[in-house]
A protein has these predicted regions:
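N-terminal "first-domain core" detector
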Residues: 1-62
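Beta-strand-rich solenoidal segments
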Residues: 2-12, 51-185
Length: 185
């Protein structure tokens, strides 16, 4: 596809759009990640109740696809091992085959899946100590700001302002020359 424009009204069945078209459109100006400024920003915290955590309300964008959660969601952490510590994670998973984006708890797994059909954002990692009976906020590491596994959704990403800066410098230099000529006279 060399050039593409979207959307256009249908005339005799020549314009059919699907989710991929809309995702491509939104991905052009919304970076994949959690929307920091919406509600609780999908922050993972201890539920202060045994082996339970909760994911706060919030929103995210994954490759142009939107996710919205308007209430806290509770997750029960698996029973701690009596032999060794383990690290679990909470991810937001977009599954194109299932046509869903949902929260998932991954016991003993801190990897993120990213392929043609699945894309995960790791919201938090949870340290489950040997024989633990409660998860505290100190056991939870917020991963939302780590752009290698999650990141923040923004409309801005490395904006190139070189042309504007060059233009400003040229104007400044011209005005400086005009001022110097005026000042000497």
């Amino acid at each position: 596809m060399t050039q593409y424009s979207f959307p256009w009204n249908d005339v005799n069945g020549d314009r059919l759009y699907d989710a991929d078209d809309f995702m491509r459109f939104f991905a052009a100006f919304l970076k994949t990640g959690v929307v920091m400024s919406y509600k609780g920003g999908l922050r993972v915290r201890s539920a202060q109740n045994g082996m339970n955590i909760q994911v706060g309300s919030g929103s995210a964008v994954i490759e142009g696809s939107s996710y919205l959660n308007d209430a806290d969601i509770g997750i029960q952490v698996n029973v701690a091992s009596s032999i060794q510590d383990r690290v679990d994670s909470v991810v937001l998973r977009m599954d194109k085959n299932a046509r869903t984006t949902q929260l998932f708890y991954k016991p003993g797994d801190t990897t993120v899946a990213r392929n043609d059909t699945t894309y995960e954002l790791q919201l938090a990692s949870i340290s489950v100590k040997t024989n633990a009976t409660q998860i505290t906020d100190a056991d939870i590491t917020d991963m939302r700001s780590d752009f290698t596994v999650c990141g923040w959704s923004t409309p801005f990403d490395n904006i190139n302002v070189d042309g504007i800066v060059d233009q400003y410098k040229e104007i400044f230099e011209q005005k400086d020359l005009e001022f110097q000529a005026w000042f000497q006279n």
